[in-house]
Amino acid sequence: MTTNTPLPHAPAAARSSRGRAVALAAVFLIVTLAGLMYVKWWPYYHKAANAADTHSIGSSILGGASSESMSDIWRSAYNYSIAYFKSVWKAAVLGIIVSSMIQALLPANWLAKAFGKASARSTLIGGAAALPGMMCSCCAAPIAVGMRKRQASIGASLAFWIGNPTLNPATLVFMTFVLSWKFTVLRLVFGLILTFGISYLAERFADRGKLGDLPNRLAIPEEPANRAPLALRWLKSLALLFLGIAPIYAVSVFLAGCLQSFMLPAWASEGIVAIVLFAVIGTLFVIPTAAEIPIAQSLLSVGTGPAAALLLTLPGVSLPSLLIVSRSFPKRVLLFVTLSVMALGVLCGIAGSLWL
């Protein structure tokens, strides 16, 4: 009688596979932390020190058209797009690199274990993971796409995407120095509701029968047993991400830039009408990280309500970031998130008009 005995090299192969996964995860962590240090943490440290001394982080990025003619509106949108991309290009590149590394370097089951369950815990972990990133919604969007391709849950991916701009610790510090602690409290309270509450509720809007297909619409096909070299797989992931995101990003930023010419019409300069208007436009408009602070500061003459509405809606989501993630989340989920940002922006504006 013959018996099947395990191959002697099987345990060694398993250990080798685990060791390789740990090594690749270490590479991912080192590159990500180094990128954040260069793009975010070190510059923001100096920016916070300057804000403490001067109570300013610069002037508003908004320009607006000199007239209502279409040529001036297009020119204004073009100038805004150039200023915007000059401000965010490093973070945008970092976001795409991190997303590609998530897909090429990290084992899929690792993210599924940490972020894969449709639960409050998974949403909480996703939001907490966003805090060191300090990215704007557009720069965090590719990472959320990468998380979805690796089977992270809707709630966790949304919390990471939304939490990056709305709970940005550096922005909260800047806001305290430039505006006041009351603005910071409003932003923090409504930011927590948006990041964790809305992200968790959005999971309930998903069609469970279609969830399995969504992350794979732009996903890299599974590699066969004799997988391609790691560098080739990473470059493939990076190229597909760039080609899928860059055109949408550029065009949508230009279109969003057209909105700055309509930020303050004469017929909506105060009261609830102004708050609603700013909440809607702020949700669709796109800004670099922390740019909502000088924008709100420059609009305080209109009222604290509209300024408070913009402090939440401008960073929360934007038309470009919604388009970037549009194939990774169900449409009804993104519609719910968009309307929720607008509604919370109105509530934040009303609270600001009464308290600030």
Named regions from a protein language model:
Residues 74-99:
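Individual transmembrane alpha-helix segments
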Residues 28-72, 94-106, 202-203, 252-263, ...:
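Structural signal for alpha-helical transmembrane segments and their membrane-water exit/capping regions
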Residues 68-70, 81, 85, 112-118, ...:
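Helix-boundary and loop/linker segments of multi-pass membrane transporters
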Residues 19-48, 113, 117, 122, ...:
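Juxtamembrane and boundary regions of transmembrane helices in multi-pass small-molecule transporters
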Residues 1-29, 46-71, 207-237:
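Intrinsically disordered, low-complexity non-transmembrane regions of multi-pass membrane transporters
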Residues 130-188, 261-334:
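Membrane-interfacial helix-loop connectors
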Residues 99, 103, 133, 194-199, ...:
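Alpha-helical transmembrane segments of multipass membrane proteins
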Residues 66, 78, 95, 101, ...:
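Transmembrane helical segments that form the transport core of multi-pass membrane transport proteins
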